[in-house]
């Protein structure tokens, strides 16, 4: 699904102050993944002008001499578009404008007449022309009347100031292909004090149309028609056209565009007929006999007997329900009276008809999955209101449908808390999310047919538990009463901390397969929690780790030739009856550290140790590093010889390692390039007080560079010689601000020492990574000469 930020903000102004990053996090929390954010390239030096006069060019039949008024004077511009006429407000590229295709607009002579600028067509201002009609490509833009003369930001009038989110929607939430259902979910979760209006006011008190409706209730849960008379078929205004173009739909005319816009907003397919070509009765059933059908795509299909849910009038198929309409009954320039249709049809029958006939449309994609009945009623109601807003008079309506019923779910607070693994006021939180209580049952929001049992309620509460504080208003209450005084503050601090260090924040899904939980069971989880109605076997258990889905993220990006980044995630995971908070860093590339002259740092365990040293120092928590010894034999993705375990108070809280090449091959990543990760259980960090006064901001300053060196000695080796080498570097090189033993551990009867050092970049000559590495390599060489074995 393509979600227009501008459309979302227009319909629900509460999202105006939500950034794209915040919105992405919010969408992830309801199971919607943001695949990409599309921003339109901008052409500068544009202005809104008004055509005052048009004359034919004396030396060219297809060119027009236009007098265009802007900046308080008339400018002569030669234009070949056939729709130029006096009174139009247009977008002008002034002399000196560089167009997206590289052309430079110059004042030049065209067959004896000097042209001073260019009047723009839509296709000249965007790189996304695949859904443009002839009008957007060949004709100049005819701006709506509200465009202001001399406005130097005219792109907003044609939607090119929009941002488009390419979304992947859960298969069991088909309604989330509409703007309204997405907004309902987000508002109930993030803006609990903002009331959602679930009324269907527009349906009420409408005159009933004379057209009779008969439906097969096994195939159709709702069928409604809206009768509109004396319409004018013309090009839509730019408010409608821009939303369609930005969502990948070609504008056609006012009526057809309204049906497509309504589907974008509500997720329900909509169709329009030339009413004068229909009979006085409409039926919905399987087609009664074999029939040839000329569709809107100008292709003829043979519809076999009883093979497709059909809308029938005058004993003919007038549309294949939620697939495609007939050419014979379609809207044309001569249409005067229109009948709009919205239905809720059997999704399996829609899918079968679409597959058998080989017809794939936006409608069939939506119709082949379940759409909640209330959403269909809402779509019908919204369409009536939309027509009124566009000054299109509704003559009458008629509909037949199943009665809307409350979705009541058995409720047990203690069972829910046991599944959550955390104490919380379940009833209060569910009420804030739009649920109500009827006796011992909980009533789901009217549009949530997908919720069936306690496990579904747990999943809804889990979304809120995993919601990070985005500091959005009017959020004033927390859904979960965390025991940690510093929890939210520290969680937010950690996100900003790692973003400031050059990592990219990701959010991944909380459900996975049992196989993945076993293969990536870093911390010896004994019990994976299974949900009762999983979408698939790949998403039926709460996960016990983050790294597995990080590999999926990298694999997906690599397959689509998207640049890889060093990523991190902070998330709560539900396993072993506890709610454990995890932090995972995954590092597939050299780390870009623009604090020091755009240098790059090679990723290895030394770098990870330096990151951990900084992190734990911030929280004043001592930690210890040990060799990897406690992993299950099922954990094959870790290179045990190139990794370590992290302990706090003798308790394993983390693992850092290179990922094995075999696993990289499995995920179709480049196994010739090492990928490292570190995953921590950060309950203690979130419960701690930050010990240092640290400000995390976007400002890039020079910070000390941390490095760690681990060496081991035989029992009979003289540590004094090693100490003298270290003292020499510590005392004689004034660029070291810190040099101390970080940890000591024993493996294979050999003592191992980890030293941490901090280099002050302001004392370097070239301030380059090479100089830093040379110092470290020189130190390592001297240590090796004294018999030390360096752990790389």
From Swiss-Prot:
Cofactor: Mg(2+)
S-adenosyl-L-methionine as UniProt keyword: no
Stretches assigned to the B5 domain: 404-472
A GO molecular function held by the record: tRNA binding
Predominant cellular place of this UniProt entry's protein: cytoplasm
Reactions catalysed, as given in the entry: tRNA(Phe) + L-phenylalanine + ATP = L-phenylalanyl-tRNA(Phe) + AMP + diphosphate + H(+)
Entry protein name: Phenylalanine--tRNA ligase beta subunit
């Amino acid at each position: 699904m393509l979600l227009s930020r501008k459309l979302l903000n227009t319909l629900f102004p509460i999202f105006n102050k939500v950034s794209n990053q915040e919105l992405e996090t919010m969408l992830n929390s309801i199971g919607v993944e943001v695949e990409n954010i599309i921003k339109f390239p901008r052409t500068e030096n544009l202005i809104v002008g008004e055509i005052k006069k048009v004359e034919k060019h004396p030396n060219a039949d297809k060119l027009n001499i236009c007098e265009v008024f802007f900046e308080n004077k008339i400018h002569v511009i030669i234009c070949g578009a056939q729709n130029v006429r006096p009174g139009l407000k247009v977008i002008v590229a002034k002399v000196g404008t560089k167009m997206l295709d590289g052309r430079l607009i110059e004042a030049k002579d065209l067959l004896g007449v000097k042209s001073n600028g260019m009047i723009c067509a839509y296709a000249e201002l965007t790189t996304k022309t695949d859904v443009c009609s002839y009008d957007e490509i060949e004709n100049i833009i005819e701006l709506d009347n509200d465009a202001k003369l001399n406005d130097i930001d005219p792109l907003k009038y044609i939607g090119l100031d929009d941002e488009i989110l390419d979304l992947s929607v859960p298969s069991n939430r088909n309604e989330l292909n509409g703007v309204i259902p997405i907004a309902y979910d987000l508002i109930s979760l993030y803006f609990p004090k903002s009331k959602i209006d679930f009324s269907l006011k527009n349906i009420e008190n409408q005159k009933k149309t004379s057209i009779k409706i008969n439906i097969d209730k096994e195939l159709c849960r709702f069928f409604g028609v809206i009768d509109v008379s004396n319409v004018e078929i013309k090009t839509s205004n730019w408010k409608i056209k821009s939303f369609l173009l930005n969502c990948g739909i070609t504008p056609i005319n006012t009526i057809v565009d309204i049906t497509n816009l309504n589907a974008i907003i509500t997720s329900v397919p909509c169709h329009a007929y030339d009413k004068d070509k229909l009979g006085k009765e409409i039926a919905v059933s399987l087609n009664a006999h074999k029939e040839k059908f000329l569709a809107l795509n100008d292709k003829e299909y043979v519809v076999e007997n009883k093979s497709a849910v059909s809308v029938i009038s005058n004993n003919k198929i007038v549309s294949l329900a939620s697939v495609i309409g007939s050419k014979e009954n379609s809207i044309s320039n001569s249409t005067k009276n229109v009948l709009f249709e919205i239905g809720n049809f059997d999704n399996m029958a829609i899918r079968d008809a679409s597959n058998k006939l080989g017809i794939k449309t936006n409608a069939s994609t939506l119709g082949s999955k379940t759409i909640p009945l209330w959403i269909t009623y809402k779509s019908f109601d919204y369409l009536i209101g939309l027509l009124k807003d566009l000054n299109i008079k509704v003559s009458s309506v008629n509909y037949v449908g199943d009665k809307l019923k409350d979705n009541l779910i058995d409720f047990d607070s203690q069972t829910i808390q046991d599944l959550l693994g955390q104490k919380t006021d379940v009833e209060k939180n569910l009420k804030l999310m739009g649920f109500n209580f009827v006796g011992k049952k909980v009533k789901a929001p009217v549009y949530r047919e997908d919720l069936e049992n306690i496990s579904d309620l747990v999943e809804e509460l889990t979304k809120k538990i995993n919601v990070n504080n985005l500091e959005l208003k009017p959020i004033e209450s927390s859904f979960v009463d965390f025991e940690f005084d510093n929890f939210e503050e520290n969680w937010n601090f950690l996100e900003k901390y790692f973003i400031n260090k050059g990592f990219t924040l990701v959010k991944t899904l909380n459900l996975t397969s049992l196989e993945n939980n076993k293969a990536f069971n870093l911390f010896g989880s004994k019990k994976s929690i299974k949900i009762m109605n999983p979408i698939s076997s790949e998403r039926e258990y709460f996960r016990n780790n983050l790294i597995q889905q990080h590999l999926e993220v990298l694999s997906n990006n690599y397959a689509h030739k998207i640049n890889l980044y060093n990523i991190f995630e902070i998330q709560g995971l539900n396993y072993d009856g506890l709610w454990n908070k995890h932090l995972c860093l995954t590092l597939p590339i050299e780390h870009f550290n623009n604090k020091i002259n755009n240098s790059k740092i090679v990723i290895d365990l030394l770098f990870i140790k330096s990151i951990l040293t900084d992190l734990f120092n911030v929280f004043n928590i001592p930690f210890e590093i040990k060799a990897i010894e406690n992993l299950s034999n099922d954990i094959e993705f870790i290179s045990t010889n190139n990794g370590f375990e992290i302990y706090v108070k003798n308790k394993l809280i983390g693992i850092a390692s290179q990922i094995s090449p075999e696993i990289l091959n499995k995920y179709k990543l480049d196994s010739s390039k090492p990928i490292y990760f570190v995953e921590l259980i950060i309950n203690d960090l979130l419960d701690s007080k930050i010990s240092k006064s640290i400000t995390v901001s976007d400002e890039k300053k020079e910070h000390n560079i941390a490095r760690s060196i681990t060496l081991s000695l035989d029992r009979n080796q003289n540590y004094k010689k090693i100490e003298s080498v270290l003292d020499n570097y510590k005392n004689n090189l004034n660029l070291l601000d810190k040099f101390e033993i970080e940890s000591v551990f024993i493996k294979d009867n050999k003592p191992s020492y980890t030293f941490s050092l901090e280099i002050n970049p302001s004392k370097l000559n070239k301030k380059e990574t090479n100089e830093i590495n040379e110092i470290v390599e020189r130190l390592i060489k001297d240590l090796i000469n004294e018999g030390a074995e360096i752990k790389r």
